[in-house]
Curated annotation (Swiss-Prot):
This is Latent-transforming growth factor beta-binding protein 1. Residues 181-213, 391-423, 618-658, 865-906, 907-948, 949-989, 990-1029, 1030-1070, 1071-1111, 1112-1152, 1153-1193, 1194-1235, 1236-1277, 1278-1320, 1415-1457, 1458-1498, 1612-1652, 1653-1697 form the EGF-like domain. Residues 63-148, 752-803 are annotated as: Disordered. Contains hydroxylated asparagine residues. Two intrachain disulfide bonds from the TB3 domain are rearranged upon TGFB1 binding, and form interchain bonds with TGFB1 propeptide, anchoring it to the extracellular matrix. InterPro entries: EGF-like_Ca-bd_dom, EGF-like_dom, EGF-type_Asp/Asn_hydroxyl_site, EGF_Ca-bd_CS, Growth_fac_rcpt_cys_sf, NOTCH1_EGF-like, TB_dom, TB_dom_sf. It is found in: Secreted; Secreted, Extracellular space, Extracellular matrix. It comes from Rattus norvegicus (Rat). Keywords: Cleavage on pair of basic residues, Disulfide bond, EGF-like domain, Extracellular matrix, Glycoprotein, Growth factor binding, Hydroxylation, Phosphoprotein, Repeat, Secreted, Signal. GO terms for molecular function: calcium ion binding; microfibril binding; molecular adaptor activity; receptor ligand inhibitor activity; transforming growth factor beta binding. The 8-Cys3 region in the third TB domain mediates the interchain disulfide bond interaction with the Latency-associated peptide chain (LAP) regulatory chain of TGFB1. Residues 1-20 form the signal peptide. Residues 136-147 have a biased composition (Polar residues). The modification Phosphoserine is found at S1405, S1588, S1607. The gene is Ltbp1. Residues 549-601, 669-721, 1338-1392, 1515-1568 form the TB domain.
Length: 1712
């Protein structure tokens, strides 16, 4: 069949034959199915397939690979060949053998011919010499020798491929045997190819050529299988397992290659045809299939886009590749995999994800490919899906009209269409032709590859279903893919049964039911969209397996939603669709934990539940209520899918039904290009358009109602413009629902398998007529990123009768249903289904192999009978189920027949029915077909039903230069031509006459086929005995002058000396003009010399060491150049780069200084400029400073803080500053501050009637008695008491005198008595007693030995006797103190005749007589000053001061001071004593406690009371806490506990500044142990004495015992019976009843029995004792101090210091 165009499909399966001493022997059977042969010059069309068989026996060792022939070894085995024509058949991925070349006119025949004929053939090739005829004697001698060898071989060799007692031409003996079973290929097969038969190499995938010497990378323009004619549709090569014999496959429907898993084969076209076929696709530069022997097997997958139905032959872009490898990692697998691992199946789904961003909002979208099943047998590929160039292509765009997806966002359109989706016809274009693809081979999705690993348990697939064995065998699947691609692994399973057993494999997206009614395998996709899914078993609580609860499908945070109706078990819920489960409250389903190795408690995969410790069982999700709302649930292995009702369609995961999208209207209307802000449509187009065309192009609004077009990027826009702005989908390509009703008949649309199955599943033929086919297309919205397929009109083929008029037209294409369903094609020859007169029959998508999971069945609205075909889609097996009113019937596929007993389609055994099949061979029945196994020398006929003899003589050069005689199953060679002799192998071989020396004694002898020729020797040689010997020319004189001679074969060569070059014939040496080269003597002049040259250099250059260049002189090597700078060499010169402040000299050989002071007048403005080497200096006068610009500027001294402050302002001047002081202040000596003016230095400022008191910024005059300061404050003026005190003298006259006044009586004999205020008669002179003037009153002082004696004032207005006769130590005014006389002296007796404690009772202080003296009430006279911090009780004479408990009275300081009990060692024995105000604390070290006396620390006794353990921590104590809660003034010298700090020293404690409780709070009282154990008497000497029986310390601050709180325990306000319940105090139980113990700052009002506020400012602030230099302001329960003007608060509480003193202290502290 010369010029035949072959397309090959390949199916490989293997079986274990036997073990031998040399290793395992596998029998690999190649089922080769070529397409129809065509005459040269025609294109291939669909035709009846023919089946041929080739059996190959191969031996491999454990370390070999199945794809390499280099390891083949072992004993010979019988080899059976099947081809479709002479020349054999090519295997997939290999070039087809060249057909026999037809005889050319005038060429010599290859039959028996004479020697003259041979001479004619030789003459055509002879160039010189004469023709020489061999002698007959030589021929006879060689022939006889060969005959003897042939006889010997005939005695030894027997069997096939034996010709004349020896191996036929192209065959040799196999090692270790005497059988001619080893083919030989010359040249040998390269690149791992295998010699299948003589001169025929079977190449590895990716290589081709006669000897497999050409790789895929070298072949850039490889022709494809075939083309397409108008009115025809290309039929791709289907997998071999789907094909049948001619008898059963004459009418197989044609299918389109869209979205199917195809095998790319590139056989070489026949002669003549290759000139007419345009190459379409560059060869795919994919990786070879890597099959690792044993544990790991790799597959190379490429994502293939889903193109439109009209597809030219060949493959598409190689964009994105998946490298899939499965196997066990070393060290991680719990078992070891040997070479004999059985059939392993991997089910996966490839995906490509991308990120789409619109206006800053990005989202991910993933596009899934078809679910794919790969099978390996014993670690080797076992089906065509594992071959090289197998690709899974996912298309983002619905390319139409035969367009192909060449990249993720581009359609490669045919010549007659254009546009983004190939939807726009090109005017004037011809019919579709073959075209080139612009896509470059090997283009990947990304620049690098990501490696990901998926860990799954190895399941077992057998007749009982799919089970997971426990402990599971863990399989790591390694996937290499681009970043945007991913692979979702669904299942890795081992198919049990004997090796080589043919298992009916399940197709992607389908389910299969075995003949026993049990599920065999379902490969439905698990409902998941994760790009890198790692399936890991769940672990559930055992106790929850039998409990029922509600199943929730959504869990957001702690909220559970989408509850399924009804109750289910936790393992059923969480193992399938649920995320949470529970009855009263939901709990999240446990996560699947990743693991390495295995354990005994591992649970099952998603979709399975555990049966026992060994196996897992599929969960029937359809038993869960509400799984498929608006649809019908179909269970699959490990998952489920939904078959939706009318008006609904499946979502991308087939797990729910969603409403159908609305159809795009074809209504036309006006299209407006502009919409005004007032919603007014403007600028309509001249033609009416549909809304889709308008809004997807230039329109802004559409229709008579001015409907605004949706904005780009919105869902509404994507609905009508799927191709984006500027692209529309024409009406004939729009989607229609697949389940739309069509009249009264049903059209079965059947998805095409993407993988070979063991049984042919094609429907029988039907009649049709030549019209465009109409069918329904899928309108279901696909998953994210999956392209929506379109349906295209094809050339007229055939028609299905009784179709509605409103249908979409299409050619036999494959609209994609979902990522889990393979391609769909229409069978135009399907028989008419039984009509029903009631409701229309539903449209069923019937997949091959009976797919319940990939079909959609829409139940009729009013049909009540049971549809067995819907309930069990696989009920017929290998056939189509037709539902009948009663039961059902089956229309079986070719090769099957309907069995009434089994009610299904069973296989027909053709070998048993037809005995005449496979003559000369053996008939072997197969599922749905049969095979003819032919012996060696025979091949199957074109019909595949018989074995016919192979005429080996038709092959070229079988018997070279001899006669070939064909025999049954072999051939032989006879009768050699003249010049030839019979070889030992039975072939005619040429006689070499040139082996005889005398044949050509003085010429060269050249042997030729069948003859020889004497040719004269060429120049440089001489002839001798048929050979040409070389002549040595170098022996001749004067050869190669100026050089050396080297003899060569037939010539000589001159090697010239330096400066000379050889002539073109290399036989002479000539001078080289080096100056012509142009690269010599640069920067100089070149002069040529004989054999050399000379350079003359210019200034600044010198001759190089090689004397061939003028190189620059580096002047910078001289150190004296460029002082104060850097020397930079230049070409032929140099340059000085001077430092800053220098410049180059006139000669440019050094740097000289720049005098900036002379050249730049702007420098040093306001100062003096001094030039320096390389720079200059500026000297600025005082008050000026140097700025950045080298100028002097004024210093703003006033910017300094504190200058002239606080009693002045700073005034900046040029070069200085000036202080402007406030009134009363003057500038200091240094002029930087304002100091107070001491006005009192001038003694006259307050004259003689007072003294001056200087103040800050001023002064005041303190005037004597009788004088006062005027309003201006200058001096002291007399006070006119007579005007100020009216009636001061009564009836006497008032006379003002300086500093005082006089009362003058009108009668000179009367005198004014100040006691009575009247004038009375003068006493007689003989009264004997001299009247003394009135005693004046001044201040009484105490403790004159104190440094601050001026502050020790007892009372301000007392007489001298009242002071000195009581407790006073001195008397005076304004600190002018007159000490009191010492008791016991005459002065004291004269002043105090009655002694201490008595004062005169009358006016006169000097009257004698006891009756005139009275007891002095010191408590009344001196107030609180006489008994500070105590209670004063007057006695006669004297007084008593009663102090609080824990304090004592100091008679010198007249004050009650705290008693330091810690001075007594008996106060705290074995503990730490801490003195407190009025008491002390005894601290015991843990675990010691106080005893009953509370004065000794002892070990605690065993008791039932549990004493709290408290650790003692010491830290800093802060004495002050600001209003912002900032700690300051830490206690210096010691660290304290929290209790010690808060109760004794500070306000906060620790580095965290822990606050102490408020001192008036109960927490403080409890912390610091301040219980009140008695009451105070209001009167009497025991008023401050508590009624406690003994005086003791306060309670331990860590342990407050209850006995100290008994008096306050549970006393409520109602129990007191006191008004207001002791407000501002607490109720205390006393012997007489109850009383109030007032809080600090309050005292008890006995009349009202309430606690009233103490006005500390009026009662306690005598002589500023509370607020020193401050004003006292009373508050509720306390008081506060506000400093007087000129004073500021000090660090002492309630003490204000003068402002100057505070400033000085601040300055001192700053200095420190």
């Amino acid at each position: 069949m010369a010029g035949a165009w072959l397309r090959w499909g390949l199916l490989l399966w293997a079986g274990l034959l036997a073990w031998s001493a040399h290793g395992r022997v596998r029998r690999i059977t190649y089922v080769v199915r070529p397409g129809p042969g065509l005459p040269a010059g025609t294109l291939p069309l669909a035709g009846p397939p023919r089946t041929f068989n080739v059996a190959l026996d191969a031996r491999y060792s454990r370390s070999s690979t199945a794809t390499s022939s280099r390891s083949l070894a072992g004993p010979p085995a019988e080899r059976t060949r099947r081809t479709s024509q002479p020349g054999g058949a090519a295997l997939p991925g290999l070039r087809s053998p060249l057909p026999p070349e037809p005889a050319r006119p005038g060429a010599p025949s290859r039959q028996l011919h004479s020697k003259a004929g041979a001479q004619t053939a030789v003459t055509r090739f002879a160039k010189h010499g004469r023709q020489v005829v061999r002698s007959k004697v030589q021929q006879d001698t060689q022939s006889s020798g060969g005959s003897r060898l042939q006889v010997q071989q005939k005695q030894q060799l027997q069997g096939i491929n034996v010709c004349g007692g020896q191996c036929c031409h192209g065959w040799s003996k196999a090692p270790g045997s005497q059988r001619c079973t080893k083919p030989s290929c010359v040249p040998p097969c390269q690149n791992g190819g295998m010699c299948l038969r003589p001169q025929f190499c079977v190449c590895k995938p990716g290589t081709k050529g006669k000897a497999c010497e050409i790789t895929a990378a070298q072949d850039t323009m490889s022709p494809v299988f075939g083309g397409q004619n108008p009115g025809s549709s290309w039929v791709p090569p289907e997998p071999a397992a789907k094909r049948t014999s001619t008898k059963k496959a004459d009418t197989l429907p044609r299918v389109s290659p869209v979205a199917q898993m195809t095998l790319t084969l590139k056989p070489k076209p026949s002669m003549g045809l290759s000139q007419q076929i345009h190459s379409q696709v560059a060869p795919l530069s994919s990786q070879n299939v890597m099959i690792r022997h044993g544990q790991t097997q790799e597959y190379v997958l490429k994502p293939k886009y889903f193109p439109a139905p009209k597809v030219v032959s060949g493959e598409q872009s190689t964009e994105g590749s998946f490298s899939l490898r499965y196997g066990q990692e070393q060290g991680t697998a719990p078992f070891q995999v040997s070479n004999h691992t059985g059939r392993i199946k991997v089910v996966f789904t490839p995906s490509i994800c991308k990120v789409t961003c619109t206006k800053g909002n990005c989202h991910n979208s993933c596009q899934k490919g078809n679910t794919t099943t790969l099978i390996s047998e014993n670690g080797h590929a076992a089906d065509t899906l594992t071959a090289t160039n197998f690709r899974v292509v996912i298309c983002h765009l619905p390319c139409m009209n035969g367009g192909q997806c060449s990249s993720r966002d581009k359609c490669q359109c045919p010549p007659n269409f254009t546009g983004k989706l190939c939807q726009i016809p090109v005017l004037g274009a011809s019919m579709p032709k073959l075209y080139q693809h612009a896509q470059q081979p090997g283009k990947a999705l990304g620049s690098h590859v990501i490696h990901s690993t998926h860990t799954l348990p190895l399941t077992m697939t057998n007749q009982q279903g799919v089970k997971v064995k426990f402990p599971p065998n863990i399989v790591n699947i390694h996937v290499k893919h681009p970043p945007e691609a991913s692979v979702q692994i669904h299942q890795v399973s081992r198919i049990d049964g004997p090796v080589g057993q043919r298992v009916k494999e399940v197709q992607p997206g389908q389910s299969q039911v075995s003949y026993q009614g049990l599920p065999v395998q379902k490969t439905q996709t698990v409902h998941s969209t994760y790009s890198h899914q790692q399936v890991i078993p769940h672990v559930y609580p055992v106790a929850a397996k039998t409990q029922l609860g509600r199943c929730f499908q959504e869990t957001i945070g702690s909220q559970c939603g989408k509850a399924l109706p009804g109750l289910s078990k936790q393992e059923d819920c969480c193992g399938t669709v649920g995320t949470s489960w529970g009855f009263n409250k939901c709990q999240k389903c446990p996560k699947k934990q990743s693991y390495h190795g295995y354990t005994q408690m591992m649970e099952c995969l998603q979709g399975y539940k555990r049966v026992n410790n060994t196996f897992c069982q599929d969960i029937n999700e359809c038993q869960l209520q509400g799984v498929c709302p608006n649809g019908e649930c179909l269970n699959t292995m490990g998952s489920y899918r939904c078959s939706c009702k009318m008006g609904f369609g499946p979502d991308p995961t087939f797990s729910s039904c969603v409403p159908d999208p609305p159809m795009i209207s074809e209504e036309k209307g006006p299209c407006y290009r502009l919409v005004s802000p007032g919603r007014q449509c403007m600028h309509p187009l001249s033609v009416h358009l549909t809304k889709q065309i308008c809004c997807c192009s230039v329109g802004k609004a559409w229709g008579p109602q001015c409907e605004k077009c949706p904005l780009p990027g919105t869902a509404a826009f994507k609905e009508i413009c799927p191709g984006g702005m500027g692209y529309t989908v024409s009406g004939i390509h729009r989607r229609r629902p697949i389940h739309q009703h069509i009249g009264k008949e049903a059209v079965f649309v059947k998805p095409k398998n993407t993988q070979p199955v063991a049984k042919s599943t094609h429907p029988p033929p039907l009649p049709a007529k030549e019209e465009p086919v109409e069918a329904l297309t899928s309108s279901r919205e696909h998953g994210p990123g999956v392209a929506e397929p379109e349906v295209v009109t094809a050339p007229p083929e055939k028609e299905i009768p009784s179709l509605d008029q409103e249908k979409t037209r299409l050619e036999p294409g494959q609209p994609q249903l979902s990522p889990g369903v393979s391609t769909i094609h229409l069978h135009p020859q399907f028989p008419v289904v039984v009509e029903k007169t009631s409701p229309p029959v539903p449209v069923e998508v019937a997949p091959e192999g009976s797919t319940s999971s990939a079909s959609q069945v829409i139940a009729p609205t009013q049909v009540t009978e049971i549809n067995e075909c819907t309930v069990n889609p696989d009920i017929c097996g290998a056939g189509h189920c037709i539902n009948l009113p009663v039961r059902y019937t089956c229309i079986c596929y070719e090769g099957y027949k309907f069995s009434e007993q089994q009610r299904k389609c069973i296989d027909i055994d053709e070998c048993a029915q037809a005995q005449h099949l496979c003559s000369q061979g053996r008939c072997e029945n197969t599922e749905g077909s049969f095979l003819c196994i032919c012996p060696a020398g025979f091949i199957a006929s074109e019909e595949g039903s018989n074995c016919i003899d192979v005429d080996e003589c038709l092959r070229p050069d079988v018997c070279r230069d001899g006669r070939c005689i064909n025999t049954a199953g072999a051939f032989r060679c006879e009768y050699c031509d003249s010049g030839y002799r019979m070889s030992r192998r039975g072939h005619c071989e040429d006689i070499d006459e040139c082996l005889t020396p005398s044949t050509c004694p003085e010429e060269q002898c050249v042997n030729s086929p069948g003859s020889y020729q004497c040719v004269p020797c060429t120049e440089g040689f001489r002839g001798w005995n048929g050979q040409c010997l070389d002549v040595d020319e170098c022996l001749q004189p004067k050869v190669c002058t100026n050089g050396s001679c080297t003899n060569l074969e037939g010539s000589y060569m001159c090697s010239c000396h330096k400066g000379y070059s050889p002539t073109p014939d290399h036989r002479h040496c000539q001078d080289i003009d080096e100056c012509q080269q142009g690269n010599l003597c640069m920067n100089g002049q070149c002069k040529n010399t004989d054999g050399s040259f000379r350079c003359t250099c210019g200034q600044g250059y010198q001759l190089s060491a090689a004397k061939d260049q003028c190189e620059d002189i580096d002047e910078c090597e001289h150190r004296h150049l460029c002082s104060h700078g850097q020397c930079r060499n230049t070409e032929g010169s140099f340059q000085c780069l001077c430092n800053q402040g220098y410049r180059a000299s006139v000669l440019g050989d050094h740097c000289e200084d720049i005098n900036e002071c002379l050249e730049d007048s702007s420098v040093c403005q306001g100062g003096d400029c001094i030039n320096t080497a390389g720079s200059y200096d500026c000297t600025c006068p005082d008050g000026l400073q140097l700025n950045d610009n080298k100028g002097c500027q004024d210093i703003n001294e006033c910017a300094q803080p504190g200058l002239c402050a606080p009693h002045g302002e700073c005034l900046n001047t040029q070069g200085s500053f000036h202080c402007v002081c406030e009134q009363g202040f003057s500038i200091s000596a240094d002029g930087r501050t304002c100091e107070d003016i001491d006005e009192c230095v001038n003694n006259t400022v307050c004259d003689s009637h007072g003294f001056c008191d200087n103040t800050a910024g001023s002064f005041r005059c303190l005037c004597y008695q009788g004088f006062q300061a005027p309003q201006d404050g200058q001096g002291c003026v007399d006070v006119n008491e007579c005007e100020l005190l009216s009636g001061v003298c009564g009836e006497a006259f008032c006379e003002n005198v300086e500093g005082s006044f006089l009362c003058v009586c009108a009668d000179e004999n009367q005198e004014y008595s100040p006691m009575t205020g009247q004038c009375r008669s003068r006493a007689t002179e003989d009264s004997g007693v001299d009247r003394q003037p009135k005693e004046e009153k001044k201040e009484c002082y105490y403790n004159l030995n104190d440094a601050s004696l001026c502050d020790n004032v007892l009372a301000p207005n007392v007489t001298k006797q009242e002071c000195c006769c009581t407790s006073g130590a001195g008397w005076g005014d304004n600190c002018e103190i007159f000490p009191c006389p010492v008791q016991g002296t005459a002065e004291f007796s004269e002043m105090c005749p009655r002694g201490k404690g008595f004062v005169p009772a009358g006016e006169s202080s000097y009257e004698t007589g006891g009756e005139n003296y009275k007891d002095a009430d010191e408590c009344l006279l001196f107030g609180e000053e006489i008994c500070k911090n105590g209670y004063c009780l007057n006695t006669q004479p004297g007084y008593e001061c009663y102090c609080k408990e824990g304090t004592y009275y100091d008679p010198v300081k007249l004050q009650c001071f705290d008693m330091d009990e810690c001075q007594d060692p008996n106060s705290c024995i074995d503990g730490q004593c801490v003195n407190t105000e009025g008491s002390y604390n005894c601290f015991c070290t843990h675990p010691m406690v106080l005893d009953a006396s509370e004065k000794r620390c002892v070990q605690p006794t065993e008791s039932n009371e549990q004493i709290e353990e408290t650790d003692v921590y010491q830290d800093l104590c802060w004495e002050h806490l600001s209003e912002e809660y900032v700690c300051s003034r830490p206690l210096v010298g010691k660290q304290t506990t929290y209790t010690e700090c808060c109760c004794l020293y500070g306000e906060a404690w620790g580095m965290q500044c822990a606050l102490c409780p408020m001192k008036d709070s109960d927490d403080y009282a409890q912390l610091c142990n301040i219980p009140v154990t008695g009451r105070r008497r209001p009167y009497g000497r025991d008023a401050l004495v508590d009624f406690s029986e003994q005086y003791g310390p306060e309670t331990d601050p860590y342990f407050i015992q209850d006995r100290f709180l008994n008096s306050f325990e549970e006393l409520q306000a109602e129990e007191c019976g006191i008004l207001n319940g002791c407000e501002n105090g607490r109720c205390v139980r006393v012997q007489e009843g109850y009383t109030c113990d007032c809080f600090d700052g309050y005292h008890l009002d006995m009349a009202k029995m309430t606690c009233v506020d103490v006005n500390e400012c009026s009662e306690l602030n005598n002589r500023m004792s509370l607020c020193k230099n401050a004003k006292c302001i009373n508050t509720e329960g306390s008081y506060k101090c506000v400093c007087l003007p000129g004073y500021v608060p000090s660090d002492k509480p309630n003490y204000c210091t003068p402002l100057n003193t505070a400033l000085n202290l601040d300055k001192d502290s700053d200095l420190e």
